[in-house]
UniProtKB/Swiss-Prot annotation:
SUPFAM superfamilies: MFS general substrate transporter. It comes from the Eukaryota. InterPro entries: MFS_dom, MFS_sugar_transport-like, MFS_Sugar_Transporters, MFS_trans_sf, Sugar/inositol_transpt, Sugar_transporter_CS. Residues 1-66, 144-149, 202-207, 264-346, 388-394, 459-475, 519-576 are cytoplasmic. Residues 1-56 are annotated as: Disordered. The chain crosses the membrane at residues 67-87, 123-143, 150-170, 181-201, 208-228, 243-263, 347-363, 370-387, 395-415, 438-458, 476-496, 498-518. Residues 38-54 have a biased composition (Basic and acidic residues). This is Low-affinity glucose transporter HXT4. Gene3D superfamilies: MFS general substrate transporter like domains (1.20.1250.20). Belongs to the major facilitator superfamily. Sugar transporter (TC 2.A.1.1) family. Residues 25-37 have a biased composition (Polar residues). Xylose uptake is strongly inhibited by glucose.
Length: 576
């Protein structure tokens, strides 16, 4: 039993919804960093076992869903940062096909027409990902220095500065390019701090759902971005692209205003000595009085956590490479999950959807993009339910398998049936419609599984002591792959057309096996329990059977989950 669990029992607190907050997790982090406490933890464990029957546990009660409306609205406001990024993704896909944008930032043919070269298109679309990667690593530290809430406000302001530079661009493509980099810095900070703050203020039994709302907001932003492009496409001047950019400015201001009503992370408040505010934050999230004994006990646990962290000193970058505490293994897993989210191929459709569906012969590819945006947004609601109903691991496995099937059909039809008489002799309408249908199936599978769940997994996995650093690195991997896919897609598509889909198919097959062998199930666990699961070295494919130490019966054998003398593949293919 961890030091925190022993402390909780000694203070008559066990398994409260507030355990889902990162501050609770941090005590386990301090235990990771101060192994000299082991003897003390063992003594406390013996004490608890001798007094377990006499303890009267105080817990913050689980309430009906209607009781969590306030915390849900607050988390949606934090998740609105995802809307900002989704808006950019949805609008840029249309900008590169709009006449005024091409005339201002493109190059001129000998016949007087304008065009965007593949290099310039790739850079203007994907460079925001480089800004995001840098911003996530550098600006996420603001959340540790000034609080998650103030850190979010600062990075949104940086995003606004980038938007202003883009709007002010007249005919210099590199000015627009610089503006997108600066906006990317802000979006990168948002992508780390938004899920982090949501996970720290959410009750444990709805944490996965509320963190998934970040992805829901991304899909809403993409959809409304598509709709705005459709509404401005008939204009022949800069209204085509400046109005969507101006609305992006307005959305960012709206988020800043909404953040004033969001509670700060209780852990940060305790760390800076604002105990009463920490009580109010926990009480607001769990719909109880700030004077409730369970809230007061929870704050005491957080205080003990903060003191333990201070004794251990500041976390260094070197700690993220610790294999003894399994931090490095978690970092590799988080980085892989975020990378594989991009390698599923979703941004192939989101960044270049308008261009792709022009290629399949559709007369109005902007309308098709709107349809895809609706499918993506509506499907994410299903994903919010699935993540808590079936768990993170099972959803990722089924998502990878179903997306593989959809991508095989999409690519095969594009390669063999789209141009029956050659690429220059027109496309088959039936084949094009088939590709659209399976693209919708693909987006449904993506939106319900691989779109929201990587954010959930990363927000739950890392010890609080190194959480901001690890989340920033993992998210940076996502952005870097986003840049590579966004930049090279025009070249690859031009060279191999829809054979490109087979590349994503291979990545999806790899994703399935990676999740099976390396991603544990964390559904229904507090952040501290997730930490214990990793410390115990539970095999990922056995993790759904894992039980936290304070809930185990006498017949529970934890060793059975830590090794597999005859795994399924040996049983299937080995000698009988």
């Amino acid at each position: 039993m961890s030091e925190e669990a022993a402390y909780q029992e000694d203070t008559a607190v066990q398994n409260t919804p507030a355990d889902a907050l990162s501050p609770v997790e941090s005590d386990s982090n301090s235990a990771l960093s101060t192994p000299s406490n082991k003897a003390e933890r063992d003594d406390m464990k013996d004490f608890d076992e001798n007094h377990e029957e006499s303890n009267n546990y105080v817990e913050i009660p689980k309430k009906p869903a209607s009781a969590y409306v306030t915390v849900s609205i607050c988390c949606l406001m934090v998740a609105f940062g995802g809307f900002v990024f989704g808006w950019d993704t949805g609008t840029i896909s249309g900008f590169v096909a709009q006449t005024d944008f091409i005339r201002r930032f493109g190059m001129k043919h000998h016949d007087g027409t304008y065009y965007l070269s593949k290099v310039r298109t790739g850079l203007m679309v994907s460079i925001i990902n480089i800004g995001c990667a840098i911003g996530g690593i550098i600006l996420a530290k603001l959340g540790d220095m000034y609080g998650r809430k103030m850190g979010l406000i600062v990075v949104v302001v940086i995003y606004i500065i980038g938007i202003i530079i883009q709007i002010a661009s007249i005919n210099k493509w590199y000015q627009y390019f610089i503006g997108r980099i600066i906006s990317g810095l802000g979006v990168g900070g948002i992508a780390v701090l938004s899920p982090m703050l949501i996970s720290e203020v959410s009750p444990k039994h709805i944490r996965g759902t509320l963190v998934s709302c970040y992805q829901l907001m991304i899909t809403l932003g993409i959809f409304l971005g598509y709709c705005t492009n459709y509404g401005t496409k008939t204009y022949t001047n800069s209204v085509q692209w400046r109005v969507p950019l101006g609305l992006g400015f307005a959305w960012a201001l709206f988020m800043i205003g909404g953040m004033t009503f969001v509670p700060e992370s209780p852990r940060y408040l305790v760390e800076v000595g604002k105990i009463e505010e920490a009580k109010r934050s926990i009480a607001l999230s769990n719909k109880v009085s700030a004077d409730d004994p369970a809230v007061m006990a929870e704050v005491e646990v957080v205080q003990a956590t903060v003191e333990a962290e201070k004794l251990a000193g500041n976390a260094s970058w070197g700690e993220i490479f610790s294999t003894k505490t399994k931090v490095f293994q978690r970092l590799i897993m988080g980085a892989m999950i975020q990378s594989l989210q991009q390698l599923t191929g979703d941004n192939y459709f989101f960044y270049y959807g308008t261009t792709v569906f022009t290629a399949v012969g559709l007369s109005d590819s902007f309308e098709t993009s709107i349809v895809l945006g609706i499918v993506n947004f509506a499907s994410t609601f299903v994903g919010i339910f699935l993540v808590e109903r079936y768990g993170r691991r099972r959803c990722l496995l089924w998502g990878a398998a179903s997306m593989t099937a959809c991508m095989v059909v999409f690519a095969s039809v594009g390669v063999t049936r789209l141009w029956p008489n050659g690429k220059k002799n027109g496309s088959s309408k039936g084949a094009g419609n088939c590709m659209i249908v399976f693209t919708c199936f693909y987006l449904f599978c993506f939106a319900t599984t691989w779109a929201p769940i990587p954010f959930v997994v990363n927000s739950e996995t890392f010890p609080l002591r190194v959480k901001s650093k690890c989340m920033a690195i993992a998210q940076a991997c996502n952005w870097i792959w986003g840049f590579l896919i966004g930049f090279f897609t025009p070249f690859i598509s031009n060279a191999i057309d829809f054979y490109y889909g087979y590349v994503f198919m291979g990545c999806l097959v790899f994703s399935y096996f990676y999740v099976f062998f390396f991603v544990p199930e964390t559904k229904g666990l507090t952040l501290e329990e997730v930490n214990t699961l990793w410390e115990e070295g539970v095999l990922p494919w056995k993790s759904p059977s894992w039980v936290p130490p304070n809930k185990r019966g006498t017949d529970y054998n934890a060793d059975d989950l830590m090794h597999d003398d005859q795994p399924f593949y040996k049983k299937m293919f080995g000698k009988k």
